[in-house]
Each structure stands twice: as C-alpha cells, then as structure tokens.
Amino acid sequence: DSNTALLWRDMGYRAILIEGIESRFNDLINNTRGYDTFCINNYVQETGDDSIDNILGRSTVELTDDNFVLMSIDIDSFDYYVFGSIKKYRPKVVIVETSSGYTPDRDFVSRNAGCSLKSVAELGETIGYKCVIHTGNAYFVRDDLVDLLPDYDYSLDVIYSSPADIDSRQGK
C-alpha cells in the first residue's frame, strides 16, 4: 500500500519517491510512468550523503515550505531517526510509520524495530511538528499550520488507534 499514490496518481501532485530495494524501485518506475514523479533508487540514512536532506537536494524538484506538502517516511525500521534528521526541509505534513502495538503511554525506539507513538510524537514536538492522528502511522502537521485545524483534543490517548481498531476499520 502507498501513503501517497492517490495524490500523484489521481490528484496531479508532483512526487519524489525514494526506494532502496532495486526490484521494488523497478516496479516503482513502471507504476509511475506517465505521472509527475521523480523516482530515486537510494537507501536513506540518518546522516551523510544518503541523508534525506541530501537525497532530496539531488532531485530536480525545487522544494519550499509552501510547495512541500507531504513527506511519508516508511522505512520499516529507523523511521524515527530519519524524521529527526530532517533539517533543510519543512513539509507541511509528515507521516511516520510507528510500531502500533505499543500503547500511547509507552516510550520505545529501536533502529531495528521502529518506534512507539509517544516517542515519535515527542520527537516531532522538538522539531516543530504536532502529532494529530494515529492510524498505525503517525500524522504530523507543521506547528505554524496547527491553528488551521479544527479545535480538537490531540492528546495521544485520544488520537491513538490500536491494531484492533485498525483491523476493525479494515473489516478484518
């Protein structure tokens, strides 16, 4: 499943798509042919030449605070660290995969097994993002845009969806 395909496929958004696994990258190229996408075959690292900032900087797409609408981080391991390493860019919305089996009061961060909602939400606050919903992924809105959202209780225990909640919404 893709967190972004609806946007670039059906709504005409431009996308930079990064895939480290070559066979999946080849599928990505085939699936995005004819759309306004820029595909990059690269593993993302926390620092160095393969940091998210450096990889995005090598694309031909000019990214500004106004036109960088969404970043989705789904690396199946150290999403937390990649989210925390973003320095140059300020997307309006960031989606970060979490290990949803942890309740919203639990701190957990691992390079090999993901992170809890609480841990990534606290990280988001330190880098200027507010966590506003959790569906297995944590959805963050840039601090300067939070006032545009409806008046709602965005506390973690309210926005958290457990694996059972997610399964029931998907008809499982």
Please place each PLM-identified region on the residue numbering.
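Rossmann-like AdoMet/SAM-dependent catalytic core
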Residues: 1-6, 11, 52-63, 100-172
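A structural signal for short, well-ordered beta-strand segments and their strand-loop junctions
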Residues: 17, 72, 93-97, 130-135, ...
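A short alpha/beta connector and helix-capping loop motif
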Residues: 81-113
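Active-site glycine- and acidic-residue-rich loops that bind
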Residues: 72-84
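SAM cofactor-binding core of SAM-dependent methyltransferases
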Residues: 1-58, 66-69, 73, 100-102, ...
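Alpha-helix C-terminal capping segments
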Residues: 28, 32, 83-87, 131-132
